[in-house]
A protein has these predicted regions:
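N-terminal leader segment of winged-helix/HTH proteins
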Residues: 1-31
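Terminal interaction helix/tail motif
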Residues: 4, 8-10, 104-147
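A structural signal for well-ordered alpha-helices, especially hydrophobic packing surfaces
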Residues: 18-21, 48, 102, 136-139
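Regular, well-ordered alpha-helical segments
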Residues: 19, 23-26, 74, 118, ...
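N-terminal helix-turn-helix DNA-binding core of bacterial DNA-binding proteins
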Residues: 23-64
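Charged, amphipathic alpha-helical coiled-coil/dimerization segments
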Residues: 71-127
Length: 147
């Protein structure tokens, strides 16, 4: 398959995938955890720990992310601290409750999705696993280049 065909298939497939992920997260989440709040918690868990970093990734204003962060702090899922290297920067971290909730949602959403994988053969499952590994590496590489 040509690179242009892969790129086109990616652009067509990923939005559909995100809709499914959003659906699984909604099924697995506590009522107060919207998909946007889930994404912020995921971002913080993987090391994006300032409002500006998260806002840039989501393509929204800092004010919009700040509201989500404030609600997550108020609910006890995130905590703020002053950066040890630059006192002007406020860093975000998951609390124990936030990490526990995020883990629970991910597990339940994965379980929801797993039932659909039954229609794939063992060979297709292996190919899908390798493709997802490649995508994960590609996303990490792109993110590193952006920083």
């Amino acid at each position: 398959m040509k690179k242009s065909e892969i790129a086109s298939k990616y652009i067509k497939t990923i939005p559909n995938s995100m809709s499914l992920v959003r659906h699984y997260i909604k099924l697995a989440s506590e009522p107060e955890v919207s998909f946007a709040r889930f994404r912020v918690m995921c971002n913080v868990s993987r090391g994006l720990n300032t409002v500006s970093e998260i806002a840039e990734l989501h393509g929204v204003s800092c004010a919009g992310i700040s509201k989500l962060v404030e609600s997550l702090v108020s609910d006890g899922y995130l905590e703020r601290s002053v950066s040890p290297t630059d006192r002007r920067i406020t860093e975000l971290d998951l609390t124990g409750a936030g990490a526990k909730l995020l883990s629970k949602i991910r597990k339940q959403a994965s379980n929801e999705f797993e039932s659909y994988l039954n229609q794939l053969t063992e060979s297709e499952l292996n190919k899908l696993g390798r493709a997802l590994d490649c995508l994960e590496s590609l996303f990490e590489s792109v993110q590193e280049r952006k920083n």
